[in-house]
């Protein structure tokens, strides 16, 4: 029999970035909160199988491959199939444990309880938790946040066995580096792993039906990204749709393309999207359902069509980034308890941890032109900056977009090492309603990559002056 029920003002299902942030926000507002997760520690996919592991692997790849040193003209050893994976996994474990401790510490607040178990709705305001020891617990909630994340989509025709044909979870369990790897997909996960393994000396072939990877980004950035990937030795096959993949039973994986071609490699990573993790939740009992893509639909405040139930993070679909998930969880908690909201979705940066990094915030040149008729666009290439020449990061660039009349900053897109850090200057400019003149009227350290803002702003100012003269 289930144990006697407990009552909470908010029950959060899933302790990843979205759920974790929702719980903290509600607790800070003085609410009684229960945070539920199937794992023994908070963190979710982000810490255990997603963001933290892949980004740690990326940093290890940069270090072990000597890419930074090579860019500066320093000789390094070659990597390949003999590279020890144990050291990579050991470092990954240390980072995961440290972040788990951090997240655990953050929820040690008055009013927050953490429970391990698998949750399922039994009524609109009632959950039943299946506990690790076999018992059950009934929980009553005034409000709910569903933040159960997502899992890799596993097309049946790809014959994923998690040993030869992998998904984005099982690739983190490799015990050695393969000589070759086929990556199916062109989204964030596919692009990140393709460049990481190429940097580690694996021969990578990336295949997708789309014309370019990361199609939601500015084409200028993705064009440079592809050139960089190819310069590392990677192969990019655009406009080629994979229709099946199988292991030959001996030593190779065979990917068949729609045009009849076959691509052979030692292992294959299938990264053809993700789907919401809602199996077993019994959403129907709460009056919930998923849309045609398998995600839980929400409004701008993360509320579902059931008034007391919210959803946040990967479970609601794109952009499926940790930073946006955190803000969605925070937004859900603040809205349900009537707390003020100030954050705009356009001010949340996106970070893509490929090699090299890419990041953007605000709107693109294309979107700015649609909204304002035209746009001021300034570019700065790292090859023109003293810091870029010193570090050898000459492939990077920054693109700044501003209103044609006022010069108000509308967005920025960056490619290059440190892009995910540099983007925050543009984010602050957006939040503060600043103009391009701000970047020229203030002094930057020299030499730094942040100078790219000043260079790009000067180009925007020149365009603005030309427009004024023409009118």
Identify the meaning behind each predicted range.
Residues 2-8, 24-31, 37-177, 205, ...:
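Glycine-rich flavin
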Residues 4-18, 177-187:
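Beta1/beta-strand and adjacent pyrophosphate-binding region of the FAD-binding site
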Residues 8, 13-18, 22-39, 45, ...:
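Flexible, glycine-rich terminal cap/loop adjacent to redox cofactors
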Residues 11-13, 119, 139-149, 183-184, ...:
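Short hydrophobic core segments
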Residues 14-19, 149, 185-190, 273, ...:
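Conserved phosphate-binding and hydrolysis motifs of nucleotide-dependent enzymes
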Residues 23, 27, 194, 198-199:
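Gly/Ala-rich phosphate-binding loop of Rossmann-like dinucleotide-binding domains
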Residues 161-177, 262-335, 429:
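FAD-site-proximal beta/loop scaffold in flavoenzymes
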Residues 231, 257, 291, 298-300, ...:
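Short, acidic, Ser/Thr-enriched surface-loop or helix-capping motifs
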